[in-house]
Amino acid sequence: MLDKLRSRIVHLGPSLLSVPVKLTPFALKRQVLEQVLSWQFRQALDDGELEFLEGRWLSIHVRDIDLQWFTSVVNGKLVVSQNAQADVSFSADASDLLMIAARKQDPDTLFFQRRLVIEGDTELGLYVKNLMDAIELEQMPKALRMMLLQLADFVEAGMKTAPETKQTSVGEPC
């Protein structure tokens, strides 16, 4: 029973999130995204490992919740924009991006399964994919890391069980 409920939440959750995501002003989304990205990539920024993004734009599209943003490095700082001309684009569903962030899925595997789509500048895409592959959970603030791992465990378990769907035939009320 709980497995079925978890599976339904995992499979229907993104569609439920899409409405609040659409209604949230981009200024608030930008603030949250810049804070989270800055936390996660602070060391990489300090070490110059994100110089490849200086003046170039990465588009990230979370398909199932219809969330898209563009990020770049400007004067050594990660910035998020609502609109930009993307040099490379990454798109995937929220659960797949969550699994990558939690180190439970490999970006290459998702790419070859066509669950992670990378388009645009090949070299820049490879740099970004390698950066995703090198995410160090230990660099995250503990509260964020724990939340990410618990959510990833929940989603992973929910993805293993297909949600139960009732079969209806023509003429039956839905």
Swiss-Prot record:
HAMAP family for this protein: UbiT (MF_02231)
Residue span(s) of domain SCP2: 45-133
Keyword Glycosyltransferase set for record: no
InterPro entries, alphabetized: SCP2_sterol-bd_dom, SCP2_sterol-bd_dom_sf, UbiT
GO cellular component: cytosol
Protein name: Ubiquinone biosynthesis accessory factor UbiT
Pfam families: SCP2
Protein's job: Required for O(2)-independent ubiquinone (coenzyme Q) biosynthesis. Likely functions as an accessory factor.
Organism listed in the record: Escherichia coli (strain K12)
Keywords tagged on the record: Ubiquinone biosynthesis
SUPFAM superfamilies, A to Z: SCP-like
Pathway participation: Cofactor biosynthesis; ubiquinone biosynthesis
GO BP: any one term: ubiquinone biosynthetic process
Gene knockout outcome: Deletion mutant is unable to synthesize ubiquinone under strict anaerobic conditions. Mutant shows normal levels of ubiquinone after aerobic growth.
Family: Belongs to the UbiT family.
Gene this protein is translated from: ubiT
